Regions:
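Anion-coordinating catalytic cores for phosphoryl-, nucleotidyl-, and glycosidic chemistry
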Residues: 12, 142, 180-182
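A generic alpha-helix structural signal
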Residues: 57, 61, 65, 133, ...
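Nuclease catalytic cores
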Residues: 1-99, 103-105, 126, 191-193
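Short amphipathic C-terminal alpha-helix that caps PH/PH-like domains
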Residues: 22-25, 129, 173-177
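Acidic, low-complexity intrinsically disordered tails
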Residues: 1, 158, 170-193
Length: 193
């Protein structure tokens, strides 16, 4: 599935920069702060592209912030952006996750993963979000856990129903440990995500 073209599609940008900028502006908006990119991000945007880049990142951030989907979680008392989780797996492995946005109540955890991609490939991120759900369940047993992809360009939430059991995650960890790794991965140890 192809989403509508964006003015940033033709800009020469470092990979992932636009999505990171959208996430940063969403985080600012959720915290009630004015939309401003951190200097570290703003400095990576080519000089002639800054106005277009920032306008489009703001537009997509507002799409989420103003959405009925986001407002549907206003009653949940706890919220965190860019939440890091590390949970232990058998055999000394660990599952490391960085959740874009998490809402939590006494009964439920809702994970939201933002995507600014132009193309949606069905199932492409299902295992990633299934692993996030497993990590949340391990850290908060008994709570209902749901996970959603939020396609910023389409203003659409998509619930990911796939589950990943502990054995599947352990199999992935074993495979990752056996496969080729770069120097940074060797220093950090096995990682699934």
């Amino acid at each position: 599935e192809e989403f509508a073209a964006s003015p940033v599609d033709n800009l020469e940008l470092p990979e992932g920069l636009f999505g990171t900028a959208c996430h940063a502006l969403i985080e600012e908006g959720l915290a009630g702060r004015p939309f401003a990119l951190p200097d570290a991000l703003a400095g990576q945007v080519p000089e002639g592209a800054k106005e277009t880049f920032l306008a489009e990142a703001r537009r997509l951030a507002l799409t989420f912030l103003d959405s009925a989907f986001r407002k549907g979680f206003d009653s949940m008392p706890r919220r965190a952006s860019e939440k890091g989780l590390i949970v232990g797996l058998p055999e000394g492995y660990a599952l490391s996750c960085r959740l874009d946005l998490v809402f939590e109540s006494e009964e439920e955890i809702v994970v939201v993963d933002f995507k600014s991609n132009r193309t949606r490939v069905p199932g492409e991120y299902d295992l990633q979000l299934a692993a996030y759900k497993t990590a949340c369940r391990m850290l908060a047993p008994g709570k209902r856990v749901r996970a959603f992809l939020y396609w910023l360009r389409a203003d659409r939430a998509e619930e990911v129903l796939r589950e990943a059991g502990l054995e599947e995650l352990l199999d992935l960890a074993r495979a990752a440990a056996l496969g080729p790794q770069d120097e940074a991965a060797e220093e950090e140890g096995p990682s699934l995500l």
